[in-house]
Amino acid sequence: MSAQDVERGLAAPVTLGLETRVEIRRAAAQLLEGMPEGTGRLVIDLTHTRQVDSAGLGALMLIQRMAVDRRQIVVLRNPSEEIRFLLTITKLYDLFTVESSYD
């Protein structure tokens, strides 16, 4: 695997919100910083995430900002239809690469 193919994964909690925002931001920052700047993908697995509130959206936006600053990519994997809709109506969908293992 070359440096350009570096991928790290992070499982999002069932509820991504006020209580979990700091933890996921810290974990994401650690993973992003562990990859060479200018390369790598951080995959946030949303398979088991059922609820995202405004604090959770804010955490995702901050993670995305960290990645952009480091020229890295954030992938949201397996978001539910509700989370996809939330990302769409808040105009955040296009900030992320969204993947489904079911595609």
What label would you give each PLM region?
Residues 1-51, 62-103:
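STAS-like cytosolic regulatory interaction modules
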